[in-house]
């Protein structure tokens, strides 16, 4: 039986699924079985060309040998959320802006055959589990690859954070980010946090526009239980969101708990450039 390769496009970036269908033909010409499972818009008749067969995630996630994600970093993050129970690796083809998590550009599409043959470099990534506790009860839980963000909507909010019960920081400001090493090159970096190697196992705790001089980023061990309490929201609006998804609104004294997940994201790259090359090119000097 041939190996199953699942193509996970964002049809709003891969217009008409042009690149996806090229990848499908390329793989099938080399003896691989393929399925198309869009991350967004699977039922959008305008986004999915007539005659293209779409397969539900539930029918492929446990059988796939490799997932090829076609889109931007957001597409990869959404795919990782779908696949946090699957062990097959995930390779990205960049159709976004920075494309920091996607090692291939469309002009490198022929390399997906190499990846299907097992010629790739694995990159296991830490994920995080999130719980929102209100009045002693868990009312929301999620799992993310990048970060959990607690943020106000235009007004300062009061937050206090602990690690295993020890207070780390307490401040008023726009919010706080708890990022994984993968997420360290995203919102956390923009808020002044450090860049951390993606295969590392750490939490990066970064205040957002803290109205106090001493609120700095902390890098914590992965076995820490991070607790953040929303202490003063009142009539302001504040939310918690995981990997940029729609946020859940917070109320006074809500508690957000973040732990290292037992699940991991199994990304791969093709050895075309190192993490440091990508950082230099895509984040530091590309647009200068």
Over which residues does each language-model region extend?
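ATP/NTP phosphate-donor binding region
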Residues: 1-66, 78, 106-123, 132-139
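ATP/nucleoside-binding phosphotransfer catalytic cores, i.e., glycine-rich phosphate-binding loops
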Residues: 150, 163-167, 216-288
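Short glycine/serine/threonine-rich phosphate/pyrophosphate-binding segments
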Residues: 16-17, 74-79, 185-190
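Catalytic core of DAGKc-family lipid kinases
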Residues: 97-174
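Redox-cofactor binding/interface segments in oxidoreductases and associated redox assembly factors
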Residues: 7, 69, 178
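Gly/Ser/Thr-rich active-site loops/lids in small-molecule metabolic enzymes
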Residues: 169-214
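Glycine-rich phosphate/dinucleotide-binding loop and adjoining beta-alpha-beta core of small-molecule
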Residues: 69-95, 103-105
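Short glycine-rich anion-binding loops that position phosphate/pyrophosphate groups of nucleotides
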Residues: 12, 73-75, 98, 182-184
């Amino acid at each position: 039986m041939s190996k199953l390769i699942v193509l996970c496009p964002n049809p709003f970036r891969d217009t008409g699924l042009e690149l996806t269908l090229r990848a499908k033909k390329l793989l099938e010409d080399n003896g691989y079985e393929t399925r198309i499972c869009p991350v967004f818009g699977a039922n959008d008749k305008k986004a999915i060309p007539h005659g293209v067969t779409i397969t539900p995630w539930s029918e492929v996630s446990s059988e796939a040998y490799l997932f090829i994600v076609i889109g931007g970093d957001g597409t990869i993050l959404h795919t990782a959320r779908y696949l946090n129970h699957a062990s097959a690796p995930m390779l990205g083809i960049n159709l976004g802006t920075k494309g920091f998590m996607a090692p291939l550009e469309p002009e490198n599409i022929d390399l997906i055959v190499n990846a299907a043959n097992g010629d790739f470099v694995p990159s296991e990534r830490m994920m995080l589990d999130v719980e929102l506790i209100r009045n002693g009860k868990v009312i929301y839980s999620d799992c993310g690859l990048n970060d959990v963000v607690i943020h106000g909507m235009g007004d300062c909010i009061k937050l206090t954070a602990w690690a295993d019960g020890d207070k780390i920081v307490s401040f008023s400001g726009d919010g706080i980010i708890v990022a994984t090493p993968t997420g360290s090159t995203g919102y956390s970096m923009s808020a002044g946090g450090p860049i951390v190697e993606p295969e590392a196992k750490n939490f990066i705790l970064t205040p957002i526009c803290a109205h106090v001089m001493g609120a700095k980023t902390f890098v914590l061990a992965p076995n820490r239980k991070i607790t953040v309490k929303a202490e003063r929201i009142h009539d302001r609006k504040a939310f918690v969101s995981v990997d940029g998804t729609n946020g859940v609104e917070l109320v006074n004294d809500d508690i957000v708990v973040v732990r290292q997940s037992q699940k991991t994201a199994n990304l791969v790259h093709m050895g075309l450039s190192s993490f440091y090359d990508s950082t230099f090119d895509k984040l530091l000097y590309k647009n200068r």
